[in-house]
Design a protein with these regions (language model features):
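Bacterial N-terminal signal peptides
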Residues: 1-3, 92
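A general, composition-driven signal for non-globular sequence regions
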Residues: 3-4, 111
Length: 201
């Protein structure tokens, strides 16, 4: 029994140091990116490296734009480093216009990662308003007849139209339902909840 107990303690110790190392690696990588962005004098959303190994940045309407502020929020949560709090708020609030996006379904990715984590970790009241407005924007994509949230618009000679699609719905859309459930909690309005459930059904 003694031997088994010490094995378990060693495993816990190894696992903890692995987690701590992962957090430290994340802190280093995100810190380097913050330094790079800050040196540019702009507020940018890094996505990946392009073919020239340069950082590719996206605008607020890109489906990936909330991931960087979300990562900073998670790092703040894991480290309690208050310098990250102001950075997370800055990069989150740079996405303010995303709350008005109605031409694609990805608003849940954008807003939940950034404002959702910001509300959860900072309690800033204005983040609640952004979440609810974003949920309203997402609800404009709900189509009564099929009971789903349409992923993309289909118009003219778009690639969606060329495929004969009328109301495309992709699995990613399920990740937007969290925004609707949260909007019901924040507002007390069950409309968001009902749309989320209809889509899931």
């Amino acid at each position: 029994v003694c031997g088994l107990g010490s094995c378990m303690k060693k495993a816990e110790s190894t696992e903890k140091s692995w987690v701590e190392q992962a957090v430290e690696n994340a802190r280093c990588q995100i810190g380097l990116e913050i330094d790079t962005i800050e040196a540019s004098g702009k507020v940018l959303n890094p996505v990946t490296l392009n073919e020239n190994e340069q950082v590719y940045y996206c605008g607020f309407s890109d489906w990936r734009s909330g991931f960087f502020p979300g990562s900073v929020w998670y790092l703040y949560e894991l480290t309690d480093d208050n310098t990250l709090l102001s950075v997370a708020q800055k990069y989150t609030e740079a996405l303010d216009e995303a709350k008005k996006l109605t031409w694609h379904h990805d608003i849940g990715f954008i807003v939940n990662c950034s404002y959702g984590n910001g509300l959860r970790l900072s309690g800033k009241a204005e983040y609640k308003d952004v979440m609810i407005e974003a949920a309203n924007s997402l609800c404009t994509r709900f189509r009564e007849k099929p009971g789903t949230i349409q992923s993309w618009n289909v118009s003219g000679n778009s690639w969606q139209a060329q495929r004969g699609w009328e109301c495309p719905v992709i699995i990613d859309n399920m990740m937007n339902l969290e925004l609707l459930f949260e909007a019901t909690k924040l507002s007390g309005d069950s409309t968001y909840y009902k749309i989320a459930v209809a889509h899931a059904d």
